[in-house]
Swiss-Prot record:
GO terms for molecular function: transmembrane transporter activity. It comes from Mycoplasma genitalium (strain ATCC 33530 / DSM 19775 / NCTC 10195 / G37) (Mycoplasmoides genitalium). Belongs to the ABC-4 integral membrane protein family. This is Uncharacterized ABC transporter permease MG064. Pfam families: FtsX. The chain crosses the membrane at residues 373-393, 487-507, 534-554, 579-599, 653-673, 1206-1226, 1255-1275, 1297-1317. The lineage of its organism: Bacteria, Bacillati, Mycoplasmatota, Mycoplasmoidales, Mycoplasmoidaceae. Keywords: Cell membrane, Membrane, Transmembrane, Transmembrane helix, Transport.
Length: 1331
């Protein structure tokens, strides 16, 4: 047996090429599998670790409650001259449905909060009493607000507890710091949802925010009972911890105070409280600002303070994606956590001193506010760190995420009160769908969201415009699944090919050694022993290939991870080298190779010795070779000989042909898809090349009438149009002595008398109104009533939009100061934050408002001061002039750089449109959308919302934009790049439709196909809903063209068709008045304004339709009373009241007289028909072309990278196989080559004969590869479409087929050269002797 093994080892030298090839195949198979499998496992492990450890939420709830104005008034029966106290009561028009619900739910608590009694504090002067009353109104409002905002029975948190859900509040603030976007995200170590997962360093410490809140409550409790009752208060309450905190944080110099506090802690009966009482005197204040509590009091005319701070507010965790970049800048995680814990125990002054000493490399700065980096981590809701709705492609250099605890957040938030914030409740629901339905049903009655926005939705819901979490979490699983799919396919393919090739190589080797095998059997050795000795042939490549392949796969994991670095931001551990893993793969490969060797060997060694030796001494032509030779009987002998050679080894020929076909198929796929993504993106971009954004709006109803519009810069101006359907009401009153107000009759500015009356009496008080913070954010007082209209306005705005209005307000005032410091400083106050050195701007109310009764000190502020009103309208006029500015100049404004504001002003003598607008039934449009039109925006169009095959779809009813200059509309083109827009505007007897490639693919549509759509946004849908009929409209369309765009299904029809299907009145068609969508190159309509739309056509100053809403009930009563003649004669002649009555009838769908006794029935109808809310957000969806392109590019690049890796691995393997098998095939003809050489044939002629085997290879290879290439390319297109909704029109071209054949020919030419070199070495006499 030993001799047999030695003989096999010696014979290996002649098969070195085959051994190298087999070793390489095993190396690639094992290495590829280990690398790709480990990469997928590593990604999955990292993602699952973050999502499971961090407890990823599956639901989001956006809260929005209508607390109302919370305005209190003094009860009229108070006798200020004789009584020591007074009572404040919540005004009737402040009692929203939410507050009324609170009164029903918990009357014992809220009855005492809507009516509160206060002391005059022994004051006798009328002015002093008035001041106390005004201060008490603020306190009463705060008391009620605090109770409402924390009452779980009223808020959604109570509903979540009933559902046994785990939840928490998510909060983040966006800050622009020197052109770098920074997001500060709140995280606490005890978070049960979306908690931080730490990869390096330490987690954040728990904040003291709850301790601060408790301390504040206890302070207010003690102070409210009076300093003179301090001893009694301390005896009856549990205030030891409170007093201990005061003692701990009081300065060491306050020896007397600390001594008295210490005595009170041990003995509440202590009589030494003189200095402690000062802390609770009337002038003392306790504020919670900047992450610390500051208690200030006056003692002997000196202001003193105790600062209770939270050192953990100085800690931060950096997101790992950003940390990779920060490390390049020299940043490090603070390593000495014990020292940090020691520093945190120091008093404030010492703490700040020690904090300053810490090297800056351990800190990050948020606009000069330093935080110590104690760790690196991520929460599962930011695994794909999308920064904001306008920045959806992560950029680790310019978009930075930092985690801080609650007090750490307050440190920065207090300096950026006007910056955009993200807030929501994130939750893990047990029964997701049913729990979401439960919450949304509850929210309809208890929240004030528009009907087109759900309060609660799934974290993965990509259709919700408020859901950024979907973009942050959905992409990663899709990426992993794609890699996993490719890895599985590639591994199976390589292993299959490796096994097949191994079989062929072993057969070739055994046949090549037939003579030796025959001699051994003739000498009496059994076939089993010979077969076992041949195992060594498979063991060497198996062991070497498996070990090197496994090592390669383990060693190159980082390279594979880096391949996806543009999309992968989670720290990912690589699998370590494992002896067990190595042994497993080695034994697995050895087992396969041994099995193949034993199987092949047993088949060959079954033959009789005589037959083995006989067949070895002659060249036997196969039956296929003989048969094929007969087809060429009329040709010469050499031709017939070459035909016989070509078909002599049929199985090898079949395999070689298959491998060649496979090679050409892969090459054809590579060539065909080389630019397919770019072509698809180019065609898609062509459709939307003329605009950057597409806005979808609320659709008009018979009740609402048309949505009104103005040039954005002119929002609020007096409307001079004559077309009644689109003209605004112009119903605001002028300001006497201020001529400019006549030009701004739709811009609401403060006027107490008209606003108080309108709020309480006018059902359409807000119709066509345009509001802004600068015009309304003032507290007006008259007869002990205080009103601030902007508070009401903010309750109607989503939190992020209210925050955006505050940011815009700051920018507006800053711009005014920048261009005209002297005039601006007359009315604008600037205060500098001591920490960040940033300026905070505010209107000086004392100079902005009139005081109509200065002599008696009652502070009856009723209207704007005339000088300020002139100043205010001059700013509106400056903004109006910016309507001529280019988008490039508007986008160039940088509020951190005042020079850009000056440059804009110098160029246009205007201010940018900085004033954030809140508008009702009117929307501001960019000038390019309007395009000089008067009654309808030129690039406004109609969108049909409907359903087809149980899938929601949108059909865009576009206009016939023939001009090419400044055309914002879509460019529709067919596969020949011919513009086909005009196909929609021909005269048809049917409704035409153009679909894009994706829609045609998804719904199997072609030109001539008909589809039936159930449209749900028709003009008369509310009419049908009122009478409980189906609001859907069925429409049938016929496809007249297929547009080239390739991403997501798109449908287009003509404006006239959409107009007809939506059932608009015919008189509106001539001027094309209706529109519910528009194209634009600016986001002004969204980022600089909030537009609200009423489907009912009524515009009350309230945010809900509910029988509990006393404001609404009273308004309806007063509107009905007008008709019943119960109002005075002067009012009864008011045409607006008549109009309000008619609009109410239309909203209710009642043509007969309304009855006062049925008010609650009418409110119930409004609640049912309009889903409980008077207003929808006018803007329902925005399509961002650049963002869509970026998403398209991300998907395309990821897919292309994976595809490139696959092809780069497969092609070399297959080519090596072809080279090896073809060489082996020719080597088997070596004995014939010797005889032909002896007959005088040259090496070239001999090789030419042998190369005849390539003729059928090419012929059959092409026959097989072409149809299968077509199928493979189609399959590739199908997979891409199914996974990403991208339609690729990759196809097999003649050039691709020729190119792949030439590549194959180049590989086979290597065989020609190698065999030619070997033939030159042959010595005829020696070879004949050996044979």
């Amino acid at each position: 047996m030993l001799n047999l093994i030695k003989n096999v080892i010696r014979s290996l030298k002649s098969a070195k090429i085959a051994l190298i090839a087999l070793t390489f195949l095993i190396f690639v198979a094992v290495g590829g599998f280990v690398l790709l499998n480990n990469t997928v496992n590593n990604f999955n492990a990292a993602f699952n670790y973050v999502t499971h450890t961090g407890k990823l939420s599956n639901a989001i709830i956006n809260e929005r409650y209508d607390f109302g104005k919370l305005e209190f008034q003094e009860q009229t029966n108070n006798s200020q001259n004789s009584s020591d106290s007074f009572t404040l009561t919540l005004t009737n028009d402040s009692r929203t449905s939410f507050i009324n619900n609170a009164l029903r739910t918990n009357p014992s608590l809220y009855e005492g909060l809507v009516t509160q009694t206060f002391s005059y504090q022994n004051k006798t002067e009328m002015t002093e009493k008035t001041n106390i009353v005004n201060q008490s109104k603020i306190i009463a409002a705060n008391n009620l607000n605090n109770a409402l905002s924390k009452d779980k029975q009223l808020l959604v948190s109570g509903q979540l507890e009933k559902l046994n859900a785990v939840f928490r509040e998510y909060k983040a603030i966006n800050i622009t710091d020197k052109s770098v976007f920074k997001k500060l995200i709140v995280s606490e170590p005890n978070d049960l949802v979306n908690s931080l997962v730490i990869f390096d360093g330490q987690n954040l410490s728990s904040s003291k925010q709850s301790d601060f809140n408790n301390f504040l409550n206890q302070f207010n409790e003690i102070k409210s009972k009076g300093k003179d009752n301090l001893s009694t208060t301390l005896k009856t309450g549990q205030y030891q911890a409170f007093l201990q905190t005061l003692f701990d944080y009081a300065q060491a110099s306050e020896t007397t105070l600390k001594d008295q506090l210490q005595k009170l802690i041990s003995n509440p009966d202590s009589s030494e409280t003189n200095q402690v009482k000062n802390l609770f005197d009337t002038p003392s204040t306790l504020t919670n600002i900047g992450g610390q509590l500051t208690l200030q009091w006056t003692e002997n005319s000196l202001t003193k303070q105790i600062v209770i701070f939270d050192p953990s507010s100085y800690e931060t965790i950096v997101a790992p994606g950003n940390w990779t970049y920060q490390q390049q800048l020299g940043k490090e995680v603070y390593p000495d956590i014990n020292n940090w814990e020691s520093i945190k125990k120091l008093p404030l002054e010492q703490f700040e001193s020690e904090f300053l000493k810490i090297d800056q490399k351990y800190k990050i700065s948020i606009d000069n506010i330093d935080y110590l980096v104690i760790g690196v981590g991520i929460s599962p809701d930011f695994v794909y760190p999308v920064f904001s709705a306008s920045l959806i492609v992560p950029n680790i250099e310019n978009e930075q995420l930092y985690y801080v605890n609650q007090t750490g957040y307050e440190r920065t938030f207090s300096s950026f009160l006007t910056n955009p914030v993200e807030t929501a409740i994130v939750a893990r629901l047990i029964n997701l769908e049913s729990d979401l339905n439960t919450i949304n049903q509850w929210a309809v009655e208890n929240m004030s969201w528009p009907t087109n926005i759900k309060a609660a939705y799934s974290s993965s819901d990509t259709t919700n415009i408020l859901n950024l979490l979907a973009a942050r979490t959905v992409f990663i699983p899709n990426l992993i699944n794609t890699i996993n799919l490719v890895a599985l396919f590639l591994t199976i393919a390589i292993l299959t090919v490796a096994i097949i090739v191994s079989i062929l190589i072993l057969i070739s080797y055994l046949k090549k050694n037939t003579e030796q095998i025959g001699i051994l059997k003739a000498n009496g050795l059994s076939g089993k022993k010979i077969n076992l000795s041949l195992l060594i042939f498979g063991l060497i490549p198996a062991i070497v290939g498996a070990i090197s392949g496994y090592s390669f796969g383990i060693g190159f994991q980082d390279v594979a991870i880096h391949l996806f670095s543009n999309y992968w931001f989670i720290p990912t551990a690589t699998s370590s080298f494992s002896v067990v893993g190595l042994l497993f793969f080695s034994l697995f490969v050895i087992l396969i190779m041994s099995s193949i060797s034993l199987l092949v060997g047993s088949i060959i060694l079954k033959k009789d010795v005589v037959k083995i030796l006989k067949h070895d001494s002659e060249f036997k032509v196969s039956r296929l070779g003989l048969s094929s030779k007969k087809l060429f009987a009329r040709f010469g002998i050499m031709t017939r000989f070459r035909v016989a050679l070509a078909f002599n080894a049929p199985w090898k020929l079949v395999f070689l042909t298959l491998m060649s076909s496979f090679t050409m198929m892969i090459l054809n796929l590579s060539f065909a898809t080389k630019d397919s993504f770019e072509n698809a993106q180019s065609k898609t971009n062509l459709t939307n090349q003329n605009h950057q954004y597409e806005f979808e709006l609320a659709s008009a109803t018979t009740q609402s009438g048309l949505l009104k519009w103005q040039l954005f810069a002119e929002l609020g101006t007096t409307d001079k149009r004559s077309e009644s359907s689109v003209k605004l009401a112009n119903k605001r009153m002028d300001i006497s002595n201020v001529d400019a107000s006549k030009d701004w009759k739709n811009q609401q500015v403060i006027n107490f008398l008209s606003d108080a009356s309108g709020f309480s009496n006018d059902l359409n008080y807000l119709e066509n109104i345009v509001q802004s913070k600068i015009g309304l954010d003032y507290s007006l007082g008259f007869n002990n009533i205080v009103s601030n209209p902007w508070r009401l306005s903010e309750t109607l705005m989503p939190t992020n939009q209210a925050s955006a209005s505050n940011t815009a307000f700051q920018n507006f005032l800053k711009a005014i100061i920048t261009i005209n410091p002297s005039q601006g400083s007359q009315f604008i106050k600037q205060t500098q934050d001591p920490l960040t050195k940033r300026f905070i701007y505010a209107i000086d109310s004392d100079k902005a408002l009139k005081n109509n009764n200065e002599q008696n000190g009652s502070q009856n502020h009723l209207t704007l001061n005339d000088d300020f009103a002139k100043f205010l309208y001059s700013q509106f006029e400056l903004i109006k002039k910016s309507g001529n500015a280019s988008n490039e100049d508007l986008n160039a404004i940088d509020f951190e750089n005042p020079q850009t504001i000056r440059d804009f002003y110098n160029k246009y003598n205007a201010l940018p449109p900085l004033d954030y607008k809140l508008s009702f039934n009117v929307i501001g449009l960019p000038k390019e959308t309007i395009a000089g039109q008067i009654d309808t925006p030129k690039y406004g169009f109609l969108t049909l919302h409907g359903e087809y095959q149980n899938t929601p779809i949108k059909i865009k009813g576009i206009k016939d934009w023939k001009d090419k200059v400044d055309n914002l509309g879509p460019v529709l083109s067919d596969q020949n790049n011919h513009i086909i827009n005009q196909e929609l505007f021909k005269n048809y007897s049917f409704d035409p439709l153009i679909v894009n490639n994706s829609a045609a693919k998804k719904y199997q549509l072609a030109i001539g196909s008909e589809i039936n759509i159930a449209v749900n946004n028709s003009f008369k849908r509310i009419d049908n809903k009122i009478i409980n009929q189906d609001p859907l409209v069925n429409a049938t369309f016929r496809v007249v063209g297929i547009n080239n765009s390739a991403h997501d299904p798109e449908f287009f029809t003509s404006y006239s068709t959409a107009f007809k299907v939506l059932e608009y009145p015919n008189e509106w068609f001539v001027k094309k008045l209706p529109f519910n969508s528009f194209y634009a190159n600016s986001l002004l309509s969204f980022v600089q304004s909030t537009s609200l739309f009423s489907e009912s056509g009524i515009f009350p100053a309230t945010s809900s339709f509910s029988t509990n809403n006393t404001v609404l009930v009273e308004l309806i009563k007063k509107t009905i009373n007008y008709k019943n003649g119960q109002m005075n004669q002067t009012s009864s002649n008011d045409s607006s009241k008549k109009e309000n009555y008619q609009k109410l009838q239309k909203a209710l769908g009642i043509s007969t007289d309304l009855e006062i006794s049925k008010v609650n029935e009418y409110v119930a109808i409004l609640a049912r028909v309009y889903n409980g809310l008077p207003y929808n957000s006018t803007i329902s969806f925005i399509s961002n072309v650049a963002a869509n392109n970026a998403l398209f590019g991300n998907i395309a690049n990821t897919t292309k990278q994976i595809q490139a890796v696959v092809i780069a691995v497969i092609i070399p393997i297959i080519m090596l196989i072809i080279l090896l098998v073809s060489t082996t095939l020719i080597q088997e003809l070596k004995k014939i080559a010797i005889r032909l050489k002896a007959l005088g044939y040259s090496n070239l002629k001999i090789l030419a004969s042998f190369l005849s085997i390539y003729i059928p290879l090419f012929a059959f290879g092409l026959l097989i590869s072409i149809p299968f290439s077509i199928y493979l390319i189609a399959l590739h297109n199908e997979v891409i479409f199914a996974s990403s909704s991208i339609f690729l029109d990759a196809f097999l071209s003649f050039e691709s087929a020729i190119g792949s054949m030439l590549v194959l020919l180049a590989v086979l030419s290597i065989t020609f050269v190698l065999n030619w070199l070997e033939l030159n070495k042959i010595k005829i006499d020696k070879e004949i002797k050996n044979s």
